[in-house]
Regions:
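Conserved beta-strand positions in repeat-built beta-propeller and related beta-rich domains
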Residues: 19-24, 60-65, 115-120, 156-161, ...
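Short loop/turn segments that connect beta-strands within beta-propeller blades
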Residues: 31-35, 72-76, 127-131, 168-172, ...
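Ankyrin-repeat and related helical/solenoid repeat scaffolds used for protein-protein interactions
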Residues: 148-196
């Protein structure tokens, strides 16, 4: 059971699993073995849905402010940036949904960071040193969420479709797909050859082997 009310983004690290909570906007580091809380960091984000680590910083997708936060390793804010592709989502239950921003994030290196943005149905490749967009690829579903890179391919969760898609990051071509019928897939990361994903409503963090 996740310690917060609604886990929504994950990022693997050698010393623990980072999880951002959409309910209380706290960032937790969890022990890989028993899920115990190693760190509990409050943040200034709102309805956070994604997290990644890189360049000595924590990066968080603040979904309801449609911003990307650059934070210190203690969770305090360094800078906040506008989210590319922000807007209303296609899966909303209202005719005029509020403007929201990014979900999944994945740091690659000092010049490359992927950001999944459901309103745009795209994953943007950004330069974290300038926070400018380099290019983007389309998503196969309407609700892209967590993502990670492995052996040159992108693995992208889609919460609405209950699937994880393996994509060519050059153009978004679907190379394979994995059904995740229950309970739901939100944030996602890779550790020890396994996919780890979080389920917001049941407050679960789950893991399955990465398909061949």
């Amino acid at each position: 059971m996740h310690p917060g009310p609604q886990p929504n983004g994950l990022q693997a690290a050698e010393d623990g699993l980072w999880a951002i909570d959409q309910g209380n906007n706290h960032l937790y580091k969890l022990d890989w073995q028993d899920g115990s809380v190693l760190e509990d960091l409050p943040t200034e984000t709102d309805r956070s849905s994604g997290v990644t680590i890189g360049g000595g910083n924590i990066w968080i997708a603040s979904t309801y402010t449609a911003e990307l936060f650059k934070c210190n390793m203690d969770g305090t804010t360094v800078e906040r940036y506008d989210t590319p592709g922000k807007g209303g989502v296609a899966f909303a239950n209202t005719p005029n949904p509020r403007t929201t921003g990014a979900h999944g994030m994945e740091w690659i290196d000092d010049e490359n960071m992927w950001v999944a943005v459901p309103p745009a149905q795209k994953v943007f490749l950004m330069d974290p040193s300038t926070m400018t967009v380099k290019r983007s690829i389309p998503t196969p579903g309407i609700r892209p969420h967590g993502l990670f890179m492995h052996e040159g391919a992108m693995w992208l969760a889609d919460t609405a479709a209950c699937k994880v898609h393996k994509l060519d990051p050059a153009d978004g071509t679907v190379l394979a797909e994995v059904d995740v019928p229950a309970p739901e897939v939100h944030g996602m990361t890779l550790h020890g050859g396994n996919m780890w994903f979080c389920c917001a409503e049941p407050r679960r963090v789950c893991t399955v082997p990465l398909p061949e």
